[in-house]
């Protein structure tokens, strides 16, 4: 999860988030190089008197500044498309969880189990236990098995919401009347926090998400106790 004064991304805990972090660094380096070149050219224009007032055309220069940006865009687009298709792929998920957004809480239904569903509300600051995180703790966590593909089906009962868990690289819009799909795989156990990431009304800031990733045996014990 995030910590005070953090400047970078949250630690990746899924293959998708690792790819997104690498893509961020790749794109940031390209942007940095372009910005440096532009600032260098501007500084030369302001500090020197070298001008070409008689130049009517320069086909070589025009060719370069047409081809070079095209190459740069391709270098950004190809890894971006690769990650996009990776996020969309899911073959034979171990588990499917239906997530519904409400004003202002989340409800979850484990479709592979009979009558396994619950609502997840934020715990008020006055009710937090020692060590609890303000505005991030919930009364019912989403317990999922680690290292197994899980399909999340996301929708909304009322207005637009967005189900987001940054450390897993997830952000899926919850749209009334529409079912969106997200895939998640956690590479290690732990608690992963997120929040609604679409302004949805007065209590938008009070819709936290908590995923508890556990080993498969522990997950099966939890489902047995819940059903």
From Swiss-Prot:
Query: Is Cytoplasm set as a keyword in this record?
Result: no
Keyword RNA-binding found: no
Instruction: Show which residues sit on the Mitochondrial intermembrane side of the membrane.
Output: 1-14, 88-227
Q: Which residues bind Cu cation A2?
A: 196, 198, 200, 204
Please give the Gene Ontology molecular function terms for this protein.
copper ion binding; cytochrome-c oxidase activity
**Ranges in the topological domain labelled Mitochondrial matrix:** 46-59
EC supergroup of this enzyme: translocase
The free-text note explaining how the cofactor binds reads:
Binds a dinuclear copper A center per subunit.
**Enzyme Commission no:** 7.1.1.9
Residues the entry annotates as binding Mg(2+) = 198
Q: Which reaction does it catalyse?
A: 4 Fe(II)-[cytochrome c] + O2 + 8 H(+)(in) = 4 Fe(III)-[cytochrome c] + 2 H2O + 4 H(+)(out)
Pfam families hit by this protein: COX2, COX2_TM
Instruction: Using the UniProt record, give the first listed, main subcellular location.
Output: mitochondrion
Q: What GO cellular-component annotations does this UniProt entry give?
A: mitochondrial inner membrane; respiratory chain complex IV
Tell where it localizes.
Answer: Mitochondrion inner membrane
What's an example GO BP annotation here? ATP synthesis coupled electron transport
Assembly behavior? Component of the cytochrome c oxidase (complex IV, CIV), a multisubunit enzyme composed of 14 subunits. The complex is composed of a catalytic core of 3 subunits MT-CO1, MT-CO2 and MT-CO3, encoded in the mitochondrial DNA, and 11 supernumerary subunits COX4I, COX5A, COX5B, COX6A, COX6B, COX6C, COX7A, COX7B, COX7C, COX8 and NDUFA4, which are encoded in the nuclear genome.
Q: What does this protein do?
A: Component of the cytochrome c oxidase, the last enzyme in the mitochondrial electron transport chain which drives oxidative phosphorylation. The respiratory chain contains 3 multisubunit complexes succinate dehydrogenase (complex II, CII), ubiquinol-cytochrome c oxidoreductase (cytochrome b-c1 complex, complex III, CIII) and cytochrome c oxidase (complex IV, CIV), that cooperate to transfer electrons derived from NADH and succinate to molecular oxygen, creating an electrochemical gradient over the inner membrane that drives transmembrane transport and the ATP synthase.
NCBIfam families in the cross-refs: CoxB
Could you say which protein family the record assigns here?
Answer: Belongs to the cytochrome c oxidase subunit 2 family.
Q: What is this protein called?
A: Cytochrome c oxidase subunit 2
